[in-house]
C-alpha cells in the first residue's frame, strides 16, 4: 500500500476521508462536500466538490475518478467527463463532474458517496518514429475486424 498526501480543504472532511468499503475494494469512496442538497435535473451536470486535495508526487502513479456503479445503474448518475484523470503533479481540490443522464431529477445529499478514486500505475512512453511496422496477425484491421462477440 502506498501513502498519499491529502489536504483537507473543508473541515467537515476530517473524519470523512476516502476509504475502501471492503478489504477487496479497488476504489476509495469520494463524498459530495456540499452545504445543502443538490438536485440535478434530467440531463444536467454539475461540478461537485469533495473537500479534499491529494498530491501523488510520483509520476509513476495517477488517480482516476470513476462513477459508483449503483448510482449509474439505478439512478443514471455518471461522470460528465466519463473518467476523471488526476495527474501526479495536480494539487487542487478533487471535483466530481456529476451528470444526470436519466429522465428524472436526482438529489445528491451532503456527504453522500458519489464517486470512487482508484490509484493506478503509469508508464510514460517515448515515441519512436518508424516508416513501417513489422507484420502482425491483425495488421490494420479496425473496429469489428476480429469477429463478433
UniProtKB/Swiss-Prot annotation:
<comment type="pathway">
    <text>Pyrimidine metabolism; dUMP biosynthesis; dUMP from dCTP (dUTP route): step 2/2.</text>
</comment>
<feature type="binding site">
    <location>
        <begin position="85"/>
        <end position="87"/>
    </location>
    <ligand>
        <name>substrate</name>
    </ligand>
</feature>
<feature type="binding site">
    <location>
        <begin position="68"/>
        <end position="70"/>
    </location>
    <ligand>
        <name>substrate</name>
    </ligand>
</feature>
<comment type="similarity">
    <text>Belongs to the dUTPase family.</text>
</comment>
<dbReference type="InterPro" id="IPR036157">
    <property type="entry name" value="dUTPase-like_sf"/>
</dbReference>
<dbReference type="InterPro" id="IPR029054">
    <property type="entry name" value="dUTPase-like"/>
</dbReference>
<dbReference type="InterPro" id="IPR033704">
    <property type="entry name" value="dUTPase_trimeric"/>
</dbReference>
<dbReference type="GO" id="GO:0046081">
    <property type="term" value="P:dUTP catabolic process"/>
</dbReference>
<keyword id="KW-0479">Metal-binding</keyword>
<dbReference type="GO" id="GO:0006226">
    <property type="term" value="P:dUMP biosynthetic process"/>
</dbReference>
<feature type="binding site">
    <location>
        <position position="95"/>
    </location>
    <ligand>
        <name>substrate</name>
    </ligand>
</feature>
<feature type="binding site">
    <location>
        <position position="81"/>
    </location>
    <ligand>
        <name>substrate</name>
    </ligand>
</feature>
<keyword id="KW-0546">Nucleotide metabolism</keyword>
<dbReference type="GO" id="GO:0000287">
    <property type="term" value="F:magnesium ion binding"/>
</dbReference>
<dbReference type="InterPro" id="IPR008181">
    <property type="entry name" value="dUTPase"/>
</dbReference>
<dbReference type="Pfam" id="PF00692">
    <property type="entry name" value="dUTPase"/>
</dbReference>
<protein>
    <recommendedName>
        <fullName>Deoxyuridine 5'-triphosphate nucleotidohydrolase</fullName>
        <ecNumber>3.6.1.23</ecNumber>
    </recommendedName>
</protein>
<dbReference type="GO" id="GO:0004170">
    <property type="term" value="F:dUTP diphosphatase activity"/>
</dbReference>
<comment type="function">
    <text>This enzyme is involved in nucleotide metabolism: it produces dUMP, the immediate precursor of thymidine nucleotides and it decreases the intracellular concentration of dUTP so that uracil cannot be incorporated into DNA.</text>
</comment>
<keyword id="KW-0378">Hydrolase</keyword>
<keyword id="KW-0460">Magnesium</keyword>
